[in-house]
Design a protein with these regions (language model features):
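C-terminal substrate-binding subdomain of Rossmann-fold SDR/epimerase-dehydratase oxidoreductases
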Residues: 19, 197-311
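Residue-level signal for the nucleotide or nucleotide-sugar donor/cofactor binding architecture
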Residues: 58, 89, 97-100, 147, ...
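Non-catalytic, surface-exposed connector residues within folded enzymatic/regulatory domains
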Residues: 88, 170-173, 187, 251, ...
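Structural element of the ATP-grasp superfamily
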Residues: 105, 160, 193, 291-292
């Protein structure tokens, strides 16, 4: 039997990963390690999908016990603090969770199961702001994160790289665009605005440059498919971008949501501008040709986003 550890499995992306992967690989055993943060929910994971262990990724004794108990074949490390706004308020918490937490997991496996397969889930934000028309590739030499969340994830990646080179651990890293779909906590743009509009409230947009700020949104099913492909076909030590081909400005996606959910084109009625972040990257433009060569493609389109908004 293949034993799999999934960290943060009650969160948004990881819960969808568990639900989809268990259906695809019913004979695999999944252990879900999650301390159930405010944005996580046990009910996100379908009954019978995984064994839930409530605990912290920084608890080395617990990790050691789990490794000895289950002798894991692979780790999918999703657990992370991810809300950028919160990272401005408490940057240290993000460093402790995302960078130090990753270090504890890696070190515990190095000591107890160094040959484990390890998939590290990161973010496009480690690249920093895109200021040219050339997309970032995995070979981009310098990471320039501009907010505490992105910096904590970049720091985690540096630790990952050191374990690849120093200890020859089998690790693959994934950097992903913005994701939407079921189980997402309503603090990120799409679920937040969807909730506000259904309640008859206004969407709150940071700053006044929303026409210049662009994001690429992907459905979580496409992301889970990419993670599965990286696991099965990716090379150890490599990094893979998961990028959407459908980039849209914040103001455009907000107007799309308003029209889809309310039926109105009186956009001013449903939009209010609030104070901008200390720094707000205008764009994360990344390339996923490396992943596409493994056979991945984006199946969900903007039409699927519209259908998701209608639900």
């Amino acid at each position: 039997m293949t034993n799999i550890l999934v960290t943060g499995g009650c969160g948004f992306i990881a819960s969808n990963f568990l639900n989809i992967m268990k259906e695809k690989y019913p004979h695999y055993k999944f252990i879900n390690l999650d301390y159930i943060d405010y944005c996580s929910n046990e009910l996100n994971v379908k009954p019978g999908t995984a064994t839930l262990v409530k605990g912290d990724i920084r608890d080395k004794d617990l990790l050691t016990y789990l490794i000895k108990q289950y002798d894991f074949d692979i780790v999918f490390h999703f657990a992370a603090k991810s809300h950028v706004d919160n990272s401005f308020e408490d940057p240290k918490d993000f460093t402790l969770n995302n960078a130090y937490g990753t270090h504890v997991i890696l070190e515990t496996f190095r000591e107890n199961k160094p040959n484990v397969e390890f998939i590290h889930f990161s973010t496009d934000e480690v690249y920093g702001e895109s200021t040219t028309g050339i997309p970032f590739s995995e070979d981009t030499g310098v990471l320039r994160p501009t907010n505490p969340y992105a910096a904590s994830k970049a720091a985690a990646e540096m630790i990952v790289q050191s374990y690849i080179y120093s200890y020859k651990m089998n690790i693959k890293t994934i950097r992903c665009n913005n994701v939407y779909g079921p189980n997402q906590f309503p603090e990120k743009l799409i679920p937040k605005f969807k909730k506000l509009l259904k309640e008859g409230k206004k969407c709150t947009i940071h700053g006044t440059k929303s026409a210049q700020i662009k994001r690429a949104f992907m459905h979580v099913e496409d992301v889970v498919n990419a993670v599965d492909i990286v696991w099965k076909k990716g090379e150890s030590g490599e990094i893979y971008n998961i990028a959407s081909d459908d980039e849209i400005s914040v103001i455009e996606v907000t107007k799309l949501m308003i029209k889809t959910i309310t039926g109105s084109e009186n956009y001013d009625k449903y939009i209010t501008f609030i104070e901008d972040r200390p720094f707000n990257d205008s764009r994360y433009y990344i390339c996923s040709q490396k992943l596409k060569k493994l056979g991945w493609k984006q199946n969900k389109t903007r039409h699927d986003l519209i259908n998701f908004l209608k639900d």
